[in-house]
Amino acid sequence: MDLLKSPLYSKYIESNAKLVNFAGWEMPISFSGLINEHESVRTSAGFFDISHMGVISLRGINPKEYIQKFFPTNLYSFSEGQGLYTLMLNEKGGIIDDLIIYDLGQQEEDISEIFLIVNASRYQTDFSWIKNNLNTNNISISNAKKDKVLFALQGKNSFKLFEEWIKSSISHIPYFGCEYKIFKHISSKEKIFFSKTGYTGENGLEILLSAKAAINLWDFLVSKNIKPCGLGARDTLRLEAGMHLYGQDLNETTTPYEAGLGWLVHLENNHDFFGREFLEKQSRFGINKKLVGLNIEGRAIGRKGCEVFKDGENIGTITSGSWSPTKQKAIAFAYIQNSYATLNNVVEILIRGKTFKGTITKRAFYKKDI
C-alpha cells in the first residue's frame, strides 16, 4: 500500500529529510537532526509540516447544538474566533481522540462553521463516529483539508515572523484564538485559517493553507534562517511540555480522569454526552490508574511498554519516554496504580533488563518563560 504524501513532499526531498511511515503518511522524522531542531524551537523558532493531521468541517445553523453530545466539555464556553482543546468519547468514557475545536462563526447567511483538528491515525474513526451519530440533516460534515497543507510555526519568534509574512498584526488574537481570512498580497481569493496553538509548549501558530501558499511560507522562513523540523523534535517538545500523544498516552480504554484530563469533563453543565454515565460513576468512586510524569536516573530511556515497579510489585507501564534536550535528563509518562501516584514517590523502572530509579513528578517537565 502506497503511503500518503503531503503537498510539501518535494520540499522534504529538497531539504534531505529523513522520512518515516507515520499513520500511513510518509513524513519527515528529522531534517538537520532532532536535537538541533528541538533547540531551535526552544530558543527561536522552527516550523513543521503537520499535513498528516485531519481537519473536519461541520457547517449548519448552530452546529454546536448538534455536536455537543460528542464532547464532555461545554461547547458554549468558547465563542467565535476561539479554539478549545477537548476530547471525543465513546459510550464507556474511553477517549476516541483528543482534538482542538474551532468556532469560525458565520460564513454565510445563517450558516456557521466549526473546524475539528484531529489526529492522523484517528481521522477516519472520528469522521465516521460523528457522521453515524449526528442524527440530523441540518449539519454537513466534510474534509476541510483535502489537498491543503497544515503547517505549524512554533517558538518565541513565531508571531513576529508570521506577522512579517502576512504583513498584518496578530497581537489582538488571544491564546487559542483563530482567524479565517484573505491576505490579498498572498492570494486575492484564498482564505487562510490560522490559530495561536501548538504542540511544543512555546508560543506558536497552526495554519491551514494551499500548497502554493505553504511553499511560499516555507521559503520565506528558510530565508530568515528558520529551520524545518521533523516529527522527532515534535515528540520531544510535546513530551517536555506535558502533552499527550494519542495511541500511546491515550486510547479508547483510557478515560479523561485516568489521563489527567478530568478538567475537560463538565459534569456540572448537565448536558448529555457519550460516556457521561460511566464518568459520573468514576468521578464518584475514583480511578484505579493514573497517568504520571517520571524523572528517570541516568541516561537510559524508558520507552513505551517498560514496566514500573514498587518494592518488587508491578504497578504500571510507561507510555511515552525520551531524553529531554532542554532538561538534560530522561523523562517519561506512565500509567500506574492510583494508590502509588503521589508526587516524589520513588519507583523502579525496568529498561532492557536493568532497573533504574524514577521519581514521580508532574507531567509538564518544561514551561516557557512568560
From Swiss-Prot:
Gene Ontology molecular-function annotations: aminomethyltransferase activity; transaminase activity
EC code(s) of this entry: 2.1.2.10
Catalytic activity: N(6)-[(R)-S(8)-aminomethyldihydrolipoyl]-L-lysyl-[protein] + (6S)-5,6,7,8-tetrahydrofolate = N(6)-[(R)-dihydrolipoyl]-L-lysyl-[protein] + (6R)-5,10-methylene-5,6,7,8-tetrahydrofolate + NH4(+)
Major enzyme class: transferase
Gene Ontology cellular component terms for the protein in this record: cytosol; glycine cleavage complex
GO biological process: glycine decarboxylation via glycine cleavage system
Domain of life, per lineage: Bacteria
InterPro entries per record: GCS_T, GCS_T_bac, GCST_C, GCV_T_N, GcvT/YgfZ/DmdA, GcvT/YgfZ_C, TrmE/GcvT_dom1
Annotated keywords: Aminotransferase, Transferase
Pfam families: GCV_T, GCV_T_C
HAMAP family: GcvT (MF_00259)
Sequence similarity: Belongs to the GcvT family.
Function: The glycine cleavage system catalyzes the degradation of glycine.
Quaternary assembly: The glycine cleavage system is composed of four proteins: P, T, L and H.
Protein name per UniProt: Aminomethyltransferase
Organism: Prochlorococcus marinus subsp. pastoris (strain CCMP1986 / NIES-2087 / MED4)
